[in-house]
C-alpha cells in the first residue's frame, strides 16, 4: 500500500486512486525562458520516481507535465534577444528535455503546451464568467476569490489576510486585492512579438494560473488523483488552480492528493540571480559531472525536506556511485531488467512510505555491504542482480562499469599488480604493498580489500 503526505489535509494518507485501474497525475512543468537549474531538476526527479512507483503498483498511469510557453519571462527574454516567443520557448524546451534525459528522467505521458490549449483556456474562463466566479474589468478578466468560500484550504491563507503588495498584485480594477487575472489585454510588446490571441474580451493572453487548470482538465478530466509541484507553488499558484477548477465544475474535487517537494538552497542561501548562485544542470554537466551523480544528489534528501546544495553533496554522490558501479562489474547491467532478479521488497516498501528515497538508498547501501561479505558466488550474483535492478528502479546504475569508469587499461596488468600486492602484504612488506596501491591509483584504479581476503577494483 502506498502512503503519501497530502498537503491539502496536512497528513500522510493511504493512497486510494479514484480508478484503481488508472492513476492520473498532473505536475507543474517548467516555464521555458532559460535552461533548467537544480531546483527545477529536483521537482522533475522526485515525480519521475513517483511515476515509476505508481506504474509498479497500479499498472496504468497517465502522467501529465505541462510546458508554460507563454509568460512575462518568456516575452522579456524574446524582447531582450530580439527574437520571438516561439523561438525562445522551442529552444529552451529542447534544452530542458536534453538536460532531463541526462539525469535519467523518463518522459511524461503527455506534455501539453499552454499555447496549444488556448481554446480550452478561453472556454474555462467563459464558464467562470457565466457562473459568477469571474468578472471583466478594464479589458481584463479576473477571478473573484470571495465567490469561492473554500479559498485558502491548501495554503491556510484567508481572503481577509490578502493585502496589496508582496505576492498580491496592487490593482484598482480588482474587487478584492487577492483577485487574480484570468485574461489580460495585449500590450505593445505582445503585438510586436505576436504573443496574443483573439478572445471574447479582445486580443490578449491568458494568466498563468488558468493555464494549468485548463490543461489538467483537457488531459485528465475534472477529477484526478495527484497534483504535484514545488512547495513554492503552493501559494498562490496551486491555491488559485483549486479555486478556478472547483468553481468551474460544481461538485468536482479537482485533485485528490496534493504533493509538494521542498525548497532547494545553495550553501544555505536562497538560489537567486541577485546572489549569483543559480546552479544550472547544463553547467554541471559541462563541468564533467555525470547526470547520474546529479540525480543521486537530488534524491539523497527526503523530497519534502529542504535540500542544501554544496560541493560535498556532489562529491558524496560521486563516491557512492563509484562504489555501487564497482559491485556491478562483470554484470550485463544493460540487460538486467530482463533478468529474473527481483527488486528488493524492503526497497519498494521504503518508496511506498511517502516516497522515502533516503531509506531506499540506505537499503541499497546495506545490500552493497552484504554483497562484499559474501563468498558463495551464486548467491552473490543473485543479490548483486537484485541490487542493480533496485537501483535502476530509481534511475541509478543505468550505465555499465566500463562506461562509468571509462576503463582503458590492461585488465591482466591490474590483476598482476593486485597479486603482487597480496604477496607483499603476506610477507609483511607493507611499503611495497603501499607503493603498488599508489601505482594503481595513478592508473585511475581504486582497490578495496574485502573481509573474505579478496581485493576488488
Swiss-Prot record:
Reaction(s) catalysed by this chain, per the record, are: tRNA(Cys) + L-cysteine + ATP = L-cysteinyl-tRNA(Cys) + AMP + diphosphate
Q: What class of enzyme is it?
A: ligase
An annotated Gene Ontology molecular function: zinc ion binding
Top-rank taxon, per record: Bacteria
Q: What residue intervals hold the motif 'HIGH' region?
A: 30-40
Tell me its cofactors.
Zn(2+)
> Where ATP is bound, by residue?
273
* Gene Ontology cellular-component terms listed: cytosol
This one is known as: Cysteine--tRNA ligase
Amino acid at each position: 500500500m502506498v502512503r503519501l503526505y497530502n498537503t491539502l489535509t496536512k497528513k500522510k494518507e493511504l493512497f486510494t486512486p479514484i480508478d484503481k485501474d488508472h492513476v492520473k497525475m498532473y505536475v507543474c512543468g517548467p516555464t521555458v525562458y532559460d535552461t533548467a537549474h537544480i531546483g527545477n531538476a529536483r521537482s522533475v526527479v522526485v515525480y519521475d520516481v513517483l511515476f515509476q512507483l505508481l506504474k509498479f503498483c497500479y499498472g496504468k498511469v497517465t502522467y501529465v507535465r505541462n510546458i508554460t510557453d507563454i509568460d512575462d519571462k518568456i516575452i522579456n527574454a524574446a524582447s531582450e534577444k530580439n527574437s520571438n516567443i516561439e523561438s525562445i520557448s522551442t529552444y529552451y524546451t529542447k534544452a530542458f528535455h536534453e538536460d532531463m534525459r541526462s539525469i535519467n528522467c523518463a518522459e511524461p505521458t503527455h506534455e501539453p503546451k499552454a499555447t496549444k490549449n488556448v481554446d480550452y483556456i478561453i472556454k474555462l474562463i467563459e464558464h467562470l464568467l457565466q457562473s459568477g466566479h469571474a468578472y471583466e474589468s478594464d479589458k481584463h478578466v479576473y477571478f473573484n476569490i470571495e465567490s469561492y468560500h473554500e479559498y485558502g484550504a491548501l495554503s491556510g491563507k484567508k481572503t481577509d489576510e490578502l493585502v496589496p503588495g508582496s505576492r498580491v498584485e496592487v490593482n484598482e480594477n480588482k474587487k478584492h486585492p487577492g483577485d487574480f487575472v484570468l485574461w489580460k489585454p495585449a500590450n505593445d510588446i505582445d503585438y510586436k512579438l505576436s504573443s496574443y490571441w483573439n478572445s471574447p474580451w479582445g486580443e490578449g493572453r491568458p494568466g498563468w494560473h488558468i493555464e494549468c487548470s485548463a490543461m489538467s482538465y483537457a488531459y485528465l478530466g475534472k477529477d484526478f488523483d495527484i497534483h504535484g509541484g514545488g512547495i513554492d507553488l503552493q501559494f498562490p499558484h496551486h491555491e488559485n488552480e483549486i479555486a478556478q477548477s472547483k468553481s468551474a465544475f460544481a461538485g468536482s474535487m479537482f485533485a485528490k492528493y496534493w504533493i509538494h517537494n521542498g525548497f532547494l538552497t545553495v550553501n544555505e542561501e536562497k538560489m537567486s540571480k541577485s546572489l549569483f548562485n543559480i546552479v544550472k544542470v547544463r553547467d554541471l554537466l559541462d563541468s564533467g559531472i555525470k547526470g547520474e551523480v546529479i540525480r543521486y544528489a537530488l534524491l539523497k534528501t527526503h523530497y519534502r525536506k529542504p535540500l542544501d546544495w554544496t560541493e560535498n553533496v556532489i562529491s558524496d554522490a560521486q563516491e557512492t556511485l563509484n562504489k555501487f558501479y564497482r559491485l556491478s562489474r562483470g554484470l550485463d547491467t544493460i540487460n538486467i531488467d530482463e533478468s529474473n532478479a527481483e527488486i528488493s521488497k524492503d526497497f519498494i516498501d521504503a518508496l511506498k512510505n511517502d516516497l522515502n528515497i533516503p531509506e531506499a538508498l540506505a537499503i541499497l547501501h546495506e545490500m552493497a555491504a552484504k554483497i562484499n561479505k559474501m563468498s558463495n558466488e551464486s548467491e552473490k550474483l543473485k543479490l548483486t542482480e537484485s541490487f542493480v535492478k533496485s537501483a535502476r528502479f530509481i534511475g541509478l546504475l543505468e550505465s555499465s562499469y566500463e562506461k562509468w569508469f571509462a576503463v582503458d587499461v590492461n585488465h591482466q596488468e591490474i590483476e598482476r599488480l593486485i597479486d603482487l600486492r597480496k604477496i607483499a602484504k603476506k610477507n609483511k612488506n607493507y611499503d611495497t604493498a603501499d607503493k603498488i596501491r599508489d601505482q594503481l591509483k595513478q592508473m585511475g584504479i581504486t582497490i578495496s580489500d574485502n573481509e573474505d581476503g579478496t581485493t576488488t577494483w
